[in-house]
Amino acid sequence: MIKYNYRKGTEFPNEERNFRKMRIYFDMDGTLADLYGVENWLEKLRSEDSSPYEEAEPMCDLRLLARLLNKAQKNGNEIGIISWLSKEATAEYDEAVRISKKRWLANHLPSVVWNEIHIIKYGAPKHFNCQDNSGILFDDNEDVRRLWNKRGMSFSEEDIIEVLSRLL
């Protein structure tokens, strides 16, 4: 697989335009869901209130994203979530966060059938926690993308629709 950092306006090499049966992963907070736009989000999370995860507004056109993801799955691709839990929390709060994130997905992307959902310890390497770390990852965290790029391709949250449109 060709490894490179994507830049808006560049062409994908032919090998990448013809990918089939790839795995496409998404981070949630700051990528699909605008957690940081929720009023008092940090204070709520520190007090172990998981509601900001459900209250977050979408960061892209989710109708278009759902159409693209459904098309990807019809073409044999698999779709997954790999997202971190909150920092330093109890087991009960971790479970509440998992439930809230899954509710957000069900409410905002109900037509998407997720092949994998991994909601893992904060800071854990995402490339170790999924079935195929040579797939594609969309994540707002540059350090996560840098690690992922050792085997796969990663893109920022700003590029989701453009990249999926070009790959499919």
Predicted features by range, described:
Residues 75-76, 106-116, 150-153:
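Structural alpha-beta junctions
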Residues 64-68, 129-131, 144-151:
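A short acidic, amphipathic alpha-helical/loop segment
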Residues 19-108:
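Alpha-helical substrate-recognition element adjacent to the catalytic core
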Residues 114-134:
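Donor nucleotide-activated moiety binding/catalytic core segment of transferases
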Residues 96-99, 112-119, 154-157:
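Lumenal/extracellular "mature" regions of secretory-pathway glycan-modifying transferases
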Residues 1-26:
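Non-catalytic pre-domain segments flanking phosphatase-related domains
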Residues 135-168:
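Acidic, Mg2+-coordinating phosphoryl-transfer loop and its flanking beta/alpha structural elements
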Residues 78-80, 118, 136:
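A structural signal for isolated positions on well-ordered beta-strands in alpha/beta enzyme cores
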